[in-house]
Swiss-Prot record:
Occurrences of domain HTH lysR-type (ranges): 1-58
Residue ranges for the DNA-binding region feature of this UniProt entry: 18-37
Full protein name: HTH-type transcriptional regulator HdfR
Domain of life: Bacteria
Lineage: Bacteria, Pseudomonadati, Pseudomonadota, Gammaproteobacteria, Enterobacterales
Entry similarity comment: Belongs to the LysR transcriptional regulatory family.
C-alpha cells in the first residue's frame, strides 16, 4: 500500500476538510480527493461521508484510523533506521492537535530560541491521538508526551506542568447553551466525565474534532459552542463566552519512559515553561 495514501487519509481525518488537507500536504484538492478514492478502491469501502462541508469518518474509516497511524509511525521509524539517522541530536515530542495549536507551538518556538547554535538539536513535533502516542512512547519511538491525562503505567514517569482553563465559547455575545449547537473538542478521555455535568445529557455534538483551530473556525457557521482555552481565545479574539456556562481547569502533564536515555535533556527542556501564563 502506498504510504502517501495513508498520509492523505490521516490528514483528511484530522482536518475534516479536503481543502485544508490539501494545503497541509501541499497538494491540490483534486489530488487529495483522488488519493482518497484510490485508498477506498483498494480497501473496497467508503472511508468518509461527504455532505457539503460536513466530512465524517465512516465506521470503516474509524477502524482504519489507528492502523493507519501505526503504519505511518512504523514507516517513519524504518526510514530513520535505514538512513542511519543520528538519534543523539533528535528529540520527538507528541501531543494532540489542540495542545499543539493552543500552547505547545509557542513552547516549541521558545525552545528553539533558547538552544545554543552549536547544539544541533533537531525537534520532531508529532500530532496523533493520545492512545497512539502512548504506544509510541512505550515502544521508544517517542521521547516525550504532553497530555491532559497521565497514563497509569509503571514504566512511565510524569511531571505536572500546571493547569489551563477552558471556557465554553461561541461567535456571538449573550447567547445561552440552549440556543447553540455543541461542537465537541477532544481534551482527553477523562474530559467526558466533566463534560457530562456541563452539557445537557441529550446534547448530540454536530461536530467532533481534535483540532481547536478547526472548532474555532466552525463556531459561526454551525451556530455552535465549544470548550476552548481561555488564554488562546483571548489571543485570537472574536469569540464570546456562553452566558450560562462555567469554566473548567485542566491539568497538563509531561510523560516519558523511566529509563529514557534522554532524561537529562527532558529535564532541561521542561525548565522552559510549557503553559507560559495559561
Amino acid at each position: 500500500m502506498d504510504t502517501e495514501l495513508l498520509k492523505t487519509f490521516l490528514e483528511v481525518s484530522r482536518t475534516r476538510h479536503f481543502g485544508r488537507a490539501a494545503e497541509a500536504l501541499y497538494l491540490t484538492q483534486s489530488a487529495v480527493s483522488f488519493r482518497i478514492r484510490q485508498l477506498e478502491n483498494q480497501l473496497g469501502v467508503n472511508l468518509f461521508t461527504r455532505h457539503r462541508n460536513n466530512i465524517r469518518l465512516t465506521t470503516a474509516g474509524e477502524k482504519l484510523l489507528p492502523y493507519a497511524e501505526t503504519l505511518m509511525n512504523t514507516w517513519q521509524a524504518a526510514r530513520k533506521e535505514v538512513a542511519h539517522t543520528s538519534r543523539h541530536n533528535e528529540f520527538s515530542i507528541g501531543a494532540s492537535a489542540s495542545l499543539w495549536e493552543c500552547m505547545l507551538n509557542a513552547w516549541l518556538g521558545r525552545l528553539y530560541q533558547l538552544q545554543e547554535p552549536q547544539s544541533g538539536l533537531q525537534f520532531e513535533a508529532r500530532i496523533a491521538q493520545r492512545q497512539s502516542l502512548v504506544k509510541q512512547l512505550h515502544e521508544r519511538q517517542l521521547d516525550l508526551l504532553i497530555t491532559t491525562e497521565a497514563p497509569k503505567m509503571d514504566e512511565f514517569s510524569s511531571q505536572l506542568l500546571g493547569h489551563f482553563t477552558l471556557a465554553l465559547y461561541c461567535s456571538s455575545p449573550a447567547r445561552k447553551k440552549s440556543e447553540l449547537n455543541y461542537l465537541r473538542l477532544e481534551w482527553g478521555p477523562d474530559f467526558q466525565q466533566h463534560e457530562t455535568g456541563l452539557i445537557a445529557a441529550d446534547e448530540v455534538p454536530v461536530l467532533t474534532t481534535s483540532s481547536a483551530e478547526l472548532a474555532r473556525q466552525q463556531l459561526s457557521a454551525l451556530n455552535g459552542c465549544s470548550w476552548l482555552p481561555v488564554n488562546w481565545v483571548n489571543e485570537k479574539g472574536g469569540l464570546h463566552t456562553v452566558a450560562d456556562s462555567a469554566t473548567l481547569s485542566r491539568p497538563l502533564y509531561a510523560i516519558w519512559l523511566q529509563n529514557s536515555d534522554k532524561y537529562s535533556l527532558i529535564c532541561d527542556l521542561l525548565k522552559t515553561d510549557v503553559l507560559d501564563d495559561q
